[in-house]
Design a protein with these regions (language model features):
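Active-site microenvironment for binding and transforming phosphate-containing groups
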Residues: 1-160
Length: 160
């Protein structure tokens, strides 16, 4: 069911806020930490929305995907996202070398882009704010940079 004039609020610190907007106005607001990205939560939300739109209307899935916009807010970037060897190997194996920053750090944004592009999202329609919550801790809350005691940001989307 598609509601009119509905809003969604997402609270986050270092995790990735992802807002997916189909050309029809249907949207999803997704909280994606490393486990969510590994389990492709944003891509699954996109799949669900595309499937629903194609069932309800006579749309081509590939055309809808190609016109979908994805907005990514501030999150912990590759320079600051140190992982254990197990998580590092999992991401490189699953999403390719694009998400490998170095021997101990992975690029969550690259892993997400791999998933979205594989589903037909035009790379030019993926808008990443480009801000790291850890590097820019004077502007953003960071669970890691603030030793587990931090505030939260809000990502808000509304369909009018």
């Amino acid at each position: 069911m598609l509601f009119r004039s509905v809003g969604a609020l997402l609270c986050f610190a270092d995790c990735m806020p992802v807002i997916i907007v189909l050309p029809t106005g249907r949207f999803a607001v997704v909280h994606a930490g490393w486990r969510g990205i590994e389990n492709e939560i944003s891509a699954k939300a996109l799949d669900l929305m595309l499937d629903q739109e194609c069932q309800e209307h006579d749309f081509s899935r590939s055309e809808l995907a190609a016109q979908t916009n994805v907005y990514i807010g501030p999150y912990i970037h590759r320079e600051c996202f140190e992982t254990g060897a197990d998580v590092h190997a999992l991401f490189v194996t699953k999403f390719g070398k694009e998400c490998r920053f170095n021997e101990t750090h992975i690029d969550l944004g690259a892993a997400l882009r791999v998933q979205l592009i594989a589903r037909g999202i035009d790379p030019a329609r993926i808008c990443d704010l480009g801000c790291c919550t850890v590097c820019e801790n004077d502007r953003f809350f960071s669970f890691r940079a603030q030793d587990g005691v931090s505030g939260r940001h809000g990502a808000f989307a509304i369909r009018l």
